Every structure is written in structure tokens, then in C-alpha cells.
């Protein structure tokens, strides 16, 4: 059995924890540089505020009550996520952090001493008393069914935020799946759900009753695995250690439009520096560095321009100096004067766990001497609270 604990309206709830005066008031959290809405409290949702709504539009809208907006504070959200994780680990021996606000728990054998839903209520109270955050808990014999149960616990308040789908109550599971739209199933996106709908499959129960071989032939092995999971066959195990990332992206929308190359170069260098820090945090090396720039697609009076360029390195690196240099070379290939740029970013790909590659004695490019040691010292200073060391390109 698995349980999925999901923090309700996570970003907005984190802001409310430290502002008791905002209880029952509509709160939204804005993206980097206050570009658009990325999180809403339940009260804000009831006002009809949509995800992705630009801040300048929201600011001019009229509501029956004031809407409180916060700039995103990712350090706070990471800290609160870690606190939730710690409290869950106090009651469950094996926990997987699926996302910043979702955690899977292995709860096999729990029912020998406590009812599953009673345990879910215990989890809710333990997290609420320790962090001030409210979680919803869904339980099932597979991860997909636990996710479906968690969806239902949010959809119908009468469950009190806790719902268990057990192997001994097949009728309850089938009833829930008959009410769950296929697009709400974990791992089924909008594109796949549209194709399923054309085949007459509109609910989770209909998908569960589909032939797995037919699904694999017409879609892929991932959707076939989902079908098996909906039927109680566990195909996705708990990952206590998160898998290594395949890509790192650092980007930001500008508060004011960027019109000069120097300002853009500084922004790209800053993104490249942060991406390199994340790369070392993953204990990875990369060979592929890409930079993208674009103007606002909403600026009707200005021509739209967006472009991306990439650099492939001969030697995998995690050295900030190499990554910044490659990012600047990529920027030089996409920069065009005369535009008012709204966003830029840096992406790292093609990861390897070590920086070792086959070299030629006559290669012009050789690995930097003592590069890893220098980066370790740099990261140690920046994370120690003693100060901040950065590169001159910023």
C-alpha cells in the first residue's frame, strides 16, 4: 500500500503560515519578477483567478474583497517542504519526495495496528501541528491508485481530506474510477486524453478495463503500465533517492525590458552561474549549454523575436567558468539589437556523473587544473554565510 500526501495550495499556504491575519483571505503567489500568478489559495480560486494570469491584469481587476499578492520565495517553500518531509518520516519509515509539495509513503503493514484512514488522519494532524500546513492523503495498492484517491479527497470535502482505496473494497475503487475523468489520471496528459476520448475512453474505469496490449500498441508502454496500476498491479516502486536530473534550466522574466547587450550578458552570466551551482549540487558534469532570449508575445505593438543557440563542449564540465564562457558564446549568436527583451535563460544538458572523457594529446582544449577543488571552495564560501563570491561577468 502507498499513501500520497499533498500539501493543499502549497505556495499560498506557506505564505499564510506566517501571516495568521490572512486566514480565509484570497492570496496569490507571483512568478519571478512578479510576472504572473503561479499559485492561488482556495479563496482566490473561488474568485475565478486563473493560473498564469499576468500580474498587471490582476492588479487592475475588481473583486468583492482585496486579493493579497506575494512575490515567490523559493527558499521559504523549500524549507517548508523539508519540514513536511521530516514530519512524514517520523510516522512512515520509507518516504519518496515526488515534488516540492507531494510525498509518497510506503504504508505496507500499517493496517495491522491501525485503520488506513485513521492513519491518514494521524498524518494530517501531525503535519498540521508541526508545520501549520494542511495535507490531503490518498491511499491505494499502487501509486496511481493512491494518486486517484488523493484527487478524490480534494474533489469531495466529505472525505475530510483522507481516502483509502483498499484491495478488499473493489466496489469503492470502481465507483471512484468511474467518476474520475481520464485526463485527471496520474501521467495522462491532455494530448493522450483527447486521443482516448475519441476511442470512447473518458473515465479512469474505462481505461482500467481496456486491454493492456491494445493500449501499448496504440500508445506506449507507460500508458500500459498506468492501466495495470489502475487494476491494482504495482508497477512503479518507491524511489527514496530521487533520480538524477536530465536537464537544468535557470531563467527569469525581466521586471523591465532589456534593450542593451551588456545588460543581457550580465543576466545570462547570472543564470549560467546559478545553473552551474545546481549542476554541482547534482554531482554531475555537462557537455551541452544552451541560451535562449525572447521578447514578450503579448506586446502587440512590438515585433516578436525569440531564439536559442547552444554550445557543445569537448570535455564535460561543472566549472562555472566554462559554462559562463559557453553561454556568452551562445548569446552572441542569438542577440539582435533593436528588441525589448522580456526573458532569457540558460539550459544545461547531456549530463555524465564524471568529467572523464577520451582526450587526444594534441587537443587544444585540456581540462582545467584543480577545477573541482576550486569549485568546492567557491560553493563552500557561498553556502557558509560568510559572504558571496561571484564572477565578474555578472
Q: Which residues fall in each region the model found?
A:
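Short, charged/polar, Gly/Pro-enriched secondary-structure boundary elements
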Residues: 112-114, 156, 300, 352-359
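A short glycine-rich, hydrophobically flanked beta-strand micro-motif that places a catalytic Asp/Glu
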Residues: 135, 139, 287-293, 342-345
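Short, well-ordered strand-loop elements centered on a beta-strand within folded domains, enriched
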Residues: 36-38, 161-164, 300-307, 355-361
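Acidic, metal-coordinating catalytic segment for phosphate/diphosphate chemistry
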Residues: 309, 313-394
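Short connector loops at helix/strand junctions that flank enzyme active sites
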Residues: 22-24, 100, 284-286, 308, ...
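Short, internal active-site loops enriched in acidic
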Residues: 109-110, 141-146, 294-299, 349-354
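Gly/Gly-Pro- and Ser/Thr-rich, intrinsically disordered tail segments characteristic of DNA damage-repair
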Residues: 1-228, 238, 365-394
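DNA-contacting surface of Y-family translesion DNA polymerases
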Residues: 184, 194-338, 356
Amino acid at each position: 500500500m502507498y499513501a500520497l500526501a499533498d500539501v493543499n495550495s502549497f505556495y499560498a499556504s506557506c505564505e499564510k503560515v506566517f501571516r495568521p491575519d490572512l486566514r480565509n483571505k484570497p492570496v496569490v503567489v507571483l512568478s519571478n519578477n512578479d510576472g504572473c500568478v503561479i499559485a492561488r489559495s482556495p479563496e482566490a480560486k473561488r474568485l475565478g483567478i486563473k493560473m498564469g494570469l499576468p500580474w498587471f491584469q490582476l492588479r487592475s481587476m475588481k473583486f468583492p474583497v482585496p486579493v493579497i499578492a506575494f512575490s515567490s520565495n523559493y527558499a521559504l517553500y523549500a524549507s517548508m517542504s523539508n519540514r513536511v518531509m521530516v514530519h512524514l518520516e517520523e510516522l512512515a519509515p520509507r518516504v519518496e519526495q515526488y515534488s516540492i509539495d507531494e510525498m509518497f509513503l510506503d504504508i505496507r503493514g500499517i493496517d495491522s495496528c491501525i485503520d488506513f484512514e485513521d492513519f491518514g488522519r494521524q498524518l494530517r494532524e501531525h503535519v498540521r501541528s508541526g508545520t501549520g500546513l494542511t495535507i490531503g492523503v490518498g491511499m491505494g495498492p499502487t501509486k496511481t491508485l493512491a494518486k486517484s484517491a488523493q484527487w478524490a479527497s480534494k474533489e469531495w470535502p466529505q472525505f475530510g481530506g483522507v481516502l483509502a482505496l483498499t484491495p478488499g473494497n473493489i466496489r469503492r475503487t470502481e465507483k471512484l474510477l468511474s467518476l474520475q475523468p481520464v485526463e485527471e489520471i496520474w501521467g495522462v496528459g491532455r494530448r493522450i486524453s483527447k486521443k482516448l476520448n475519441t476511442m470512447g475512453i473518458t473515465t479512469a474505469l474505462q481505461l482500467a478495463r481496456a486491454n493492456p496490449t491494445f493500449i501499448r500498441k496504440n500508445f506506449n508502454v507507460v500508458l500500459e503500465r498506468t492501466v495495470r496500476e489502475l487494476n491494482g498491479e504495482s508497477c512503479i516502486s518507491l524511489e527514496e533517492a530521487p533520480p538524477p536530473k536530465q536537464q537544468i534550466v535557470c531563467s527569469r522574466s525581466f521586471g523591465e525590458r532589456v534593450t542593451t547587450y551588456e545588460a543581457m550578458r550580465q543576466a545570462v552570466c547570472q543564470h549560467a552561474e546559478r545553473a552551474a551551482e545546481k549542476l554541482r549540487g547534482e554531482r554531475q558534469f555537462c557537455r551541452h549549454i544552451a541560451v535562449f532570449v525572447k521578447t514578450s508575445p503579448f506586446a502587440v505593438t512590438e515585433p516578436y523575436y525569440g531564439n536559442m543557440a547552444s554550445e557543445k563542449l569537448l570535455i564535460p564540465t561543472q566549472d562555472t567558468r566554462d559554462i559562463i564562457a559557453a553561454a556568452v558564446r551562445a548569446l552572441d549568436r542569438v542577440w539582435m539589437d533593436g528588441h525589448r527583451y522580456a526573458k532569457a535563460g540558460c539550459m544545461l544538458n547531456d549530463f555524465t556523473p564524471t568529467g572523464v572523457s577520451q582526450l587526444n594529446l594534441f587537443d587544444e582544449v585540456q581540462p582545467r587544473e584543480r577545477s573541482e577543488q576550486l569549485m568546492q571552495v567557491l560553493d563552500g564560501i557561498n553556502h557558509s554565510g560568510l559572504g558571496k563570491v561571484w564572477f565578474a561577468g555578472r
